[in-house]
From Swiss-Prot:
Homodimer and homohexamer; in equilibrium. Substrate binds at residues 39-40, 103-111, 136, 160. The gene is pyrR1. It comes from the Bacteria. This is Bifunctional protein PyrR 1. A motif (PRPP-binding) lies at residues 99-111. The lineage of its organism: Bacteria, Bacillati, Bacillota, Bacilli, Lactobacillales. Regulates transcriptional attenuation of the pyrimidine nucleotide (pyr) operon by binding in a uridine-dependent manner to specific sites on pyr mRNA. This disrupts an antiterminator hairpin in the RNA and favors formation of a downstream transcription terminator, leading to a reduced expression of downstream genes. Also displays a weak uracil phosphoribosyltransferase activity which is not physiologically significant. It comes from Lactiplantibacillus plantarum (strain ATCC BAA-793 / NCIMB 8826 / WCFS1). Belongs to the purine/pyrimidine phosphoribosyltransferase family. PyrR subfamily. GO terms for molecular function: RNA binding; uracil phosphoribosyltransferase activity. The keyword Glycosyltransferase applies. Keywords: Glycosyltransferase, RNA-binding, Transcription, Transcription regulation, Transcription termination, Transferase. Gene3D superfamilies: 3.40.50.2020. It holds the Pfam family Pribosyltran. It catalyses: UMP + diphosphate = 5-phospho-alpha-D-ribose 1-diphosphate + uracil.
């Protein structure tokens, strides 16, 4: 049975705090691009951009990445042996920009590694930062987020689920013990 660990109001506050941290750590926000990792990372990137516009009056472009074909547990290649680029919607040239990758949960780091590979196929940003709503620990790769909504330590036999209004009909974060 899942137990809610973050409600909608706490989630909103965490996203607002991330937005303030992004503003504070950047000399202006005109060079930023948010890129959400499919699926919930896209909605979170859009929310961060909306909040940033409310606070700073600046429209920050928002793009999306589907990293399915870049995962190290997926082996789809075309006839030439090249990984197929799939599902990226990046509305601006990212060369020389500060890209902030956005995802819902950081766990092993493998999704972020795949996103970095996919992103580099689209250009060469001046800087890449990582914003996550939840950092649950248990990294398998040396990846550390720059902006964290909530640190939620978990056991390996637990699953963190993020619900977003745009996708799930409500906001919240819950933890559930996996079946053995």
């Amino acid at each position: 049975m899942a137990r809610e660990v973050v409600d909608a109001m706490t989630m909103r506050r965490a996203l607002t705090r991330i937005t303030y941290e992004i503003i504070e750590q950047n000399k202006g926000v005109g060079n930023l691009v948010f890129i959400g990792i499919k699926t919930r990372g896209i909605f979170l990137a859009q929310r961060l951009a909306q909040r940033l516009k409310q606070l700073e009056g600046v429209d920050v472009p928002v793009g999306s990445l589907d990293i399915t074909l870049y995962r190290d547990d997926h082996h789809a290649v075309d006839v030439a042996g090249q990984a197929k680029l799939n599902g990226a919607d990046i509305p601006v040239d990212i060369n020389g920009k500060h890209v902030i990758l956005v995802d819902d949960v950081l766990f092993t780091g493998r999704t972020v590694r795949a996103a970095l590979d996919a992103l580099m196929d689209h250009g060469r940003p001046a800087k890449i930062s990582l914003a996550v709503l939840v950092d649950r620990g248990h990294r398998e790769l040396p990846i550390r987020p720059d902006f964290i909504g909530k640190n939620i330590p978990t056991a390996l036999d637990e699953q963190v689920s993020v619900a977003l209004e745009e996708h799930d009909g409500h906001d919240g974060i819950s933890i559930e013990k996996l079946e053995e």
